[in-house]
């Protein structure tokens, strides 16, 4: 003990270390900027400074689309969880179990039915956090069930695609979901109901070879990666350097592969407007402000009449 400790007594520090949440801050992949997670979440997972569109979970996506943030979760058919008893470095069944615990979802696709600016719509969302949004038996069943429900309800069907492709652990059973979903889309088309695809980052592989490229209208989020094979694979195959921005949403818009690139904040009114146009529904009449009444007239000031002199 020295003279300093005699003057300033050491304080007892907290033995338990204060835990800091891992996702308290987010680093923007585009600018490298550190952003508070709550700010990004409140901004629909768009980085405020750089406008970079982060990946958005299925529940958050549905919440941002439906009126009053309410909808009905559509019950999806049960499938065999591990039909091939697949195993690589880990068992496929264990990977599914971990993905379910991490995301709270049964599989990569979530389907909801609700109101979009007063119009009934069915929306299916792929969650990339669930095994890369890969298309397996359960995801295929979810898409087909969503399309069937849209026909039953006579409502538009909207899908938010986000996937790395078919799920390799399910083999040919996964690839079979491509023609199955294609047939289901044709069923919706025969019912003359709108089918709108929103391609988010990334939309690749077997998904782009099936239902993600069959929409009546294709919308892409800014900067989304959209394509079948990866750019590196294409370059190695054709032995040529690909142009700048190849397979990005803006490049595909310039070359006619998508109809529009829409900021996430503008998606909801854009989708509602498209659904009304394609179903020939009347436009929503927004409540007009009450006409302002003119201010009441001020009462006229009464002046005393001047006295008139009379002669005697």
UniProtKB/Swiss-Prot annotation:
GO molecular function term, any single one: carboxyl- or carbamoyltransferase activity
Spans annotated as Disordered: 286-312
Subcellular compartments: Cytoplasm
Pathway field: Lipid metabolism; malonyl-CoA biosynthesis; malonyl-CoA from acetyl-CoA: step 1/1
Principal location listed in the UniProt entry: cytoplasm
Domain CoA carboxyltransferase N-terminal as annotated: residue spans: 24-293
Alphabetized Pfam families for the sequence: Carboxyl_trans
Keyword Lipid metabolism: yes
Record's keyword terms, sorted: ATP-binding, Cytoplasm, Fatty acid biosynthesis, Fatty acid metabolism, Lipid biosynthesis, Lipid metabolism, Nucleotide-binding, Transferase
EC number: 2.1.3.15
Gene Ontology CC annotations of this record: acetate CoA-transferase complex
Reaction(s) this enzyme catalyzes, per UniProt: N(6)-carboxybiotinyl-L-lysyl-[protein] + acetyl-CoA = N(6)-biotinyl-L-lysyl-[protein] + malonyl-CoA
UniProt GO BP: fatty acid biosynthetic process; malonyl-CoA biosynthetic process
Keyword Transferase among UniProt keywords: yes
Domain of life: Bacteria
Biased composition range(s): Low complexity: 299-312
Family recorded in the similarity comment: Belongs to the AccD/PCCB family.
Record note on quaternary structure: Acetyl-CoA carboxylase is a heterohexamer composed of biotin carboxyl carrier protein (AccB), biotin carboxylase (AccC) and two subunits each of ACCase subunit alpha (AccA) and ACCase subunit beta (AccD).
Role of this protein: Component of the acetyl coenzyme A carboxylase (ACC) complex. Biotin carboxylase (BC) catalyzes the carboxylation of biotin on its carrier protein (BCCP) and then the CO(2) group is transferred by the transcarboxylase to acetyl-CoA to form malonyl-CoA.
PANTHER family in the cross-refs: ACETYL-COENZYME A CARBOXYLASE CARBOXYL TRANSFERASE SUBUNIT BETA, CHLOROPLASTIC
Protein name as annotated: Acetyl-coenzyme A carboxylase carboxyl transferase subunit beta
Organism field: Bradyrhizobium sp. (strain ORS 278)
Classification of source organism: Bacteria, Pseudomonadati, Pseudomonadota, Alphaproteobacteria, Hyphomicrobiales
């Amino acid at each position: 003990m020295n003279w300093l400790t005699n003057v300033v007594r050491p304080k007892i520090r907290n033995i338990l270390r204060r835990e800091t949440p891992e996702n308290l801050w987010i680093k923007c992949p585009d600018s490298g900027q550190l952003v508070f997670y709550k700010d990004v979440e409140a901004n629909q997972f768009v980085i405020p400074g750089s406008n970079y569109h982060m990946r958005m979970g299925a529940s958050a996506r549905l919440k941002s689309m439906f009126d009053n943030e309410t909808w009905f979760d559509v019950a999806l058919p049960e499938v065999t969880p591990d039909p091939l008893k697949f195993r690589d470095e880990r068992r496929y069944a264990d990977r599914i179990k971990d993905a379910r615990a991490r995301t709270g979802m049964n599989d990569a696709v979530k389907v909801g039915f609700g109101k979009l600016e007063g119009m009934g719509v069915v929306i299916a969302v792929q969650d990339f956090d669930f095994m890369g949004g890969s298309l397996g038996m359960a995801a295929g069943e979810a898409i087909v069930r969503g399309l069937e429900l849209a026909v039953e309800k006579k409502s538009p069907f909207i899908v938010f695609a986000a996937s790395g492709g078919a799920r390799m652990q399910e083999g040919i059973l996964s690839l079979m979901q491509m023609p199955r979903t294609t047939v289901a889309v044709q069923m919706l088309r025969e019912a003359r109901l709108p089918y709108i695809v929103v391609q988010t980052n990334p939309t690749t592989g077997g998904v782009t070879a099936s239902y993600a490229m069959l929409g009546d209208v294709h919308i892409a989020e800014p900067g989304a990666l959209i394509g079948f094979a990866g750019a590196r694979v294409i370059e190695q195959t054709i032995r040529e350097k690909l142009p700048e921005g190849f397979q990005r949403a803006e490049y595909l818009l310039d070359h006619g592969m998508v109809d529009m690139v829409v900021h996430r904040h503008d998606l909801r009114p854009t989708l509602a407007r498209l659904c009304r146009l394609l179903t020939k529904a009347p436009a929503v009449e927004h409540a007009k402000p009450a006409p302002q009444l003119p201010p009441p007239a001020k009462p006229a000031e009464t002046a005393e009449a001047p006295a008139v002199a009379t002669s005697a």
